[in-house]
């Protein structure tokens, strides 16, 4: 079982869907064991569908305030996980002034789904949520009392 990093940043393009979901999932799974934040190349208000699908699993995203990489100038992270190609480029720039690991998890942007059917759109968001949940559990395993 690998040790948890002390600080993780999840990053995507707008900090309105993917990275806030990942941040909230990581906090849900690991609580205060790890400092977790999220950012985007640009910022946009939290997406209502993201709030809805996270609420389905008992995680509240409604209070999320979007940030950009520029808002993180004084923060330090052990690892930056990028969820979009655009965020990957920004993370590489960030590592010029911060020695940290960068991982790219190519993650679909569900806000690009065009459908009049709300359930089709929600299913796309659920798919991203569930993929992020599994990826985070695989990369940062949750320790049970038997593991200690």
What are these regions (language model features)?
Residues 38, 63, 82, 103-106:
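Structural signal for conserved beta-strand scaffold positions within catalytic alpha/beta enzyme cores
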Residues 55-58, 82-85, 102:
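Short, charged low-complexity intrinsically disordered segments located at boundaries
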Residues 2-7, 72-83, 125:
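Cytosolic catalytic domains that perform sulfur/thiol-centered chemistry
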Residues 90-148:
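Phosphate-binding/catalytic loops
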Residues 75-98:
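Mid-chain, well-packed structural core segment of small domains
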Residues 15, 54, 80-81, 132:
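Conserved small-residue
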Residues 43-45, 87, 109-111:
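Residue-level detector of flexible, active-site-proximal loop/helix-junction positions
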